[in-house]
Design a protein with these regions (language model features):
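Solvent-exposed, non-transmembrane regions of membrane-associated and secreted proteins
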Residues: 1-140, 158-178
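Alpha-helical transmembrane segments
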Residues: 145-160
Length: 179
């Protein structure tokens, strides 16, 4: 899920948004990044299952070629105005994931706060590399081969698009000169 700057409606339609005024999600001591996303959208999962995340679960953020692993320390439901759990804390590297609840009513917020695990486990680094590898575009090969076979068929069968008639031929036909 891509993370964009800001939390406008347009931003949250594309992916998760970084809450302005909080630390950027780049890690480091005394940082607390807040990432928000929608849930319950028909066209995207985003944070739909955030209510199922529990203490001890882990997630990763890939930023600037580095993989950061976070382990969930607490989950809570708060009113939208309650921001006391989003403050930085001495020497802690925190990320809080936020979405609306109850689904469809959206009167409260789910906060899932996690602390960074250092060093990043090798298994998380390997998983991030594997997920970011783009597969070979086999669809392009299939399209090119299919197009080539069809073109070869038409060429070998002698089927040609009739050439355009010249202007004088058209005028001659109109005058009845053609036999």
């Amino acid at each position: 899920l891509p993370i964009y700057h800001g939390t406008s409606d347009d931003t949250l339609k594309k992916g998760a948004g970084h809450l302005e005024g909080t630390s950027l999600p780049v890690g480091g001591p005394r940082t607390h990044s807040v990432i928000t996303a929608h849930r319950g959208l028909a066209e995207a999962t985003m944070f739909t299952n955030l209510n199922k995340v529990g203490v001890g679960d882990r997630f990763t953020i890939e930023v600037m070629g580095e993989v950061l692993t976070y382990e969930v320390r607490e989950t809570r439901v708060v009113s939208p105005e309650d921001t006391r759990f989003l403050q930085t804390q001495d020497d802690r590297d925190l990320v809080t994931l936020v979405t609306c609840t109850p689904l469809g009513i959206n009167t409260h917020r789910i906060l899932v706060t996690a602390e960074r695990i250092t060093p990043t486990p090798q298994s998380d680094i390997d998983a991030a590399r594997q997920a970011s590898q783009i597969g070979f575009p086999w669809w392009a090969v299939i399209f090119a081969v299919g197009f080539s076979v069809i073109a070869l068929f038409f060429w070998r069968s002698g089927y040609m698009i009739p050439p355009k008639k010249k202007e004088e031929d058209i005028e001659g036909e109109a005058d009845g000169d053609e036999l």
